[in-house]
């Protein structure tokens, strides 16, 4: 390799996508185990989503009390994310199996709650454990991308989305057959425990470091755009069925197709990113995806029949599907081994504010102007993403 090529290889491009390169077999095996952790993590939360009504009933909580208890998920997760970033920088990937084991150990707690205060405490603990695992496995994938020079983040998030679907369906069917809430959550937690054991070996460190100063100037902006993407994700996931029922008069079965179509489109969109990201600029993909989401949500807000709204939610999901993988991957790859954990924690923590802000923001909008207005709020978030994407130094 001549000197020019060496310099070009060593020159750090901030927040840039990686190109395909055949990885070492051992590193590839490590990547497969890390990807399996995403599926296990998604399976747990899919099972949880299907079991929320049973958990609410066991705790004797009203809808309002359940909403308050669920708020403790975020209260616990955000500080835990920040702490995990520092731990990753200091201890490295050995933190990953510890966080997964912690999540597995506490995952069953919500099913054991028999009062609202107990449920709130359980959600606080589970939120903290989930936050640590979330940052750790995303940082692990980002580190593997740096080590292998391959795009992995879209596949990781696709597996998480696939796990959500699989866990929700499996838990729903098992619940219908008479299975208890605690055993079902314990089974989902056992998958996470198995992934913890599988991920007990850290990924190999990459040899070159990237300048921390250049990355820091972009992290907050990346996190804020991620928050808008998560606002859209959470909004469609949690409000699409309600929109179909209350605004369009759909029955419960038809209304359920809204979040289902959205979830499926997220999986397909993220899987497509495995081939698309190495071939196109990340900023262009993010911009075009946001514009697609914007158009789909505007059309959905004006829909008068579920046959229009359901595809609208699906197309919106496809448009936003690659936002989080692009932003998480860029933040992690743009950092050195010495500060990748903090970089991932910063973007993840800011990003998850979108999930927390979504329910009160969309709820207040729905109360003031109706659910069509809430969908337009999501469209506005997509417009901001489209405007901001070219300025994020993504390549």
Enumerate the language-model features and the residues they cover.
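Short amphipathic helix-loop junctions that connect adjacent transmembrane helices
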Residues: 50-64, 238-254
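Interfacial helix-cap and linker-helix signal at transmembrane-aqueous boundaries
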Residues: 55-56, 87-88, 173-178, 244-245, ...
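Helix-loop junctions at membrane interfaces in 12-TM secondary transporters
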Residues: 111-122, 302-311
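Symmetry-related core transmembrane helices of the 12-TM Major Facilitator Superfamily/SLC fold
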Residues: 182-199, 373-391
């Amino acid at each position: 390799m001549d000197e020019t090529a060496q310099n070009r290889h060593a020159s750090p491009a901030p927040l840039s996508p990686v190109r395909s390169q055949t990885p070492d077999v051992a590193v590839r095996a490590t990547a497969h185990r890390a990807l399996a952790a995403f599926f296990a993590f998604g399976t747990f939360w899919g099972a949880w989503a299907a079991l929320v009504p049973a958990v609410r009933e066991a705790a004797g909580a009203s809808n309002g009390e359940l909403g308050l208890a669920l708020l403790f998920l975020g209260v616990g997760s955000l500080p835990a994310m920040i702490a995990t970033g520092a731990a990753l920088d200091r201890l490295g990937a050995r933190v990953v199996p510890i966080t997964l084991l912690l999540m597995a150990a506490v995952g069953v707690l919500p099913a054991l709650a028999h009062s609202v205060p107990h449920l709130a405490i359980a959600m606080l603990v589970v939120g903290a454990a989930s936050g640590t695992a979330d940052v750790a496995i995303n940082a692990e994938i980002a580190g593997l991308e740096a080590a292998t020079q391959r795009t992995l983040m879209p596949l990781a998030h696709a597996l998480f989305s696939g796990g959500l679907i699989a866990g929700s369906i499996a838990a729903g069917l098992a619940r219908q057959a008479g299975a208890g809430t605690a055993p079902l959550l314990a089974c989902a937690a056992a998958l996470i425990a198995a992934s913890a054991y599988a991920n007990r070996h850290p990924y190999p460190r990459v040899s070159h470091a990237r300048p921390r100063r250049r990355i820091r100037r972009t992290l907050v902006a990346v996190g804020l755009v991620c928050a808008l993407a998560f606002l859209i994700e959470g909004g469609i996931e949690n409000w699409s069925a309600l929109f179909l029922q209350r605004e369009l008069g759909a029955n419960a079965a038809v209304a359920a197709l809204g979040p289902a179509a959205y979830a499926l489109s997220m999986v397909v969109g993220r899987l497509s990113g495995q081939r698309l990201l190495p071939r196109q600029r990340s900023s262009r993909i993010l911009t075009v995806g946001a514009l697609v989401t914007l158009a789909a949500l505007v059309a959905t807000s004006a829909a008068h029949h579920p046959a229009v709204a359901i595809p609208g939610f699906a197309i919106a999901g496809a448009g936003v599907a690659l936002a989080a993988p692009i932003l998480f991957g860029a933040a992690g790859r743009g950092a050195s081994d010495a500060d990748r954990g903090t970089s991932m924690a910063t973007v993840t923590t800011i990003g998850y504010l979108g999930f927390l802000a979504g329910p009160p923001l969309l709820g207040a909008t729905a109360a003031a102007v109706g659910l069509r207005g809430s969908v337009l709020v999501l469209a506005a978030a997509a417009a901001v993403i489209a405007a901001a994407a070219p300025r994020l130094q993504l390549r």
